[in-house]
Amino acid sequence: MTLLMIFTILLVASSQIEGHLKFDIHDAQHYFETFIINYNKQYPDTKTKNYRFKIFKQNLEDINEKNKLNDSAIYNINKFSDLSKNELLTKYTGLTSKKPSNMVRSTSNFCNVIHLDAPPDVHDELPQNFDWRVNNKMTSVKDQGACGSCWAHAAVGTLETLYAIKHNYLINLSEQQLIDCDSANMACDGGLMHTAFEQLMNAGGLMEEIDYPYQGTKGVCKIDNKKFALSVSSCKRYIFQNEENLKKELITMGPIAMAIDAASISTYSKGIIHFCENLGLNHAVLLVGYGTEGGVSYWTLKNSWGSDWGEDGYFRVKRNINACGLNNQLAASATIH
């Protein structure tokens, strides 16, 4: 049975109530068995399967509630549907300000702090819609797996697009180099994007993924400076109150690594998110564009949960409502040599 057929079965088995996707909780066992086939889930014993079903059923109820609240976004069963919220945040995010106990950090390079306090300049002629995916400036969506390396993926994603803008050529850069060699962050236990940029300035450069492939676990640092694909010349940390100020920075500086609260987006499928938790920052993503659809203005963000999540690995949130906690002091970007 193909993936498309299985998804069709799920959608037919569910019902549309007032335009919203709603699953019949009485059919939760059916949805769960289909989910197991769809995502090739394997549980070691019946006890574990029953435990996962309990979580799955709770997530179904949560999906129904989200679909009721969000009139321009759809939530659905996906690969995370048998995980609790705590499991998702522990294994699949990774934003943290904690530092390794044995941290060795050079003080030679720091990001400049940029305050975007002034209202957007009305004379700036910015396009109504913008997206760095246009003209082939974004690499494919990656999957961090069960490693809290979102910070590395967001930082590296920024640099990949900057390289494409400068050279009109896409390359995949190495998140694993940061996981193994960045002594100021905590590998799969989390980190910060601006700190990653600072550490890359200190290291001298970043290798390509083909030369330093992703493992999703911390290993011995294997930097080879003869294989650096680029170097980071400077970086910025943004402090802003008005989200609209990000539009000009996005266009002139390139994609911006952003911190969000990902607690309520795990089952996102498509559309523009209106209602999103903002209880604490825990995940890093990449701001790549903005636009308007159906009268709703939105930001487009690239995630690191694989292309089988969301809108081919991307998601959209409504602009100017601090959706998912976007208004924070951890946004960062860089420039390259």
Swiss-Prot record:
Protein's UniProt keywords contain Signal: yes
Protein origin, superkingdom: Viruses
Glycosylation sites recorded in the entry for this protein: 172
Active site residues according to the UniProt entry: 150, 283, 303
Residues making up the signal peptide according to the UniProt record: 1-19
Disulfide bonds: 147-188, 181-221, 276-324
SUPFAM superfamilies named among the record's database cross-references: Cysteine proteinases
Disulfide bond keyword on record: yes
SMART domains from the UniProt entry: Inhibitor_I29, Pept_C1
InterPro entries: Papain-like_cys_pep_sf, Pept_asp_AS, Pept_cys_AS, Pept_his_AS, Peptidase_C1A, Peptidase_C1A_C, Peptidase_C1A_papain-like, Prot_inhib_I29
Catalytic activity: Endopeptidase of broad specificity, hydrolyzing substrates of both cathepsin L and cathepsin B
Propeptide residue span(s): 20-126
Family: Belongs to the peptidase C1 family.
Function: Cysteine protease that plays an essential role in host liquefaction to facilitate horizontal transmission of the virus. May participate in the degradation of foreign protein expressed by the baculovirus system.
Official protein name in the record: Viral cathepsin
Organism: Adoxophyes honmai nucleopolyhedrovirus
Gene that encodes the chain: VCATH
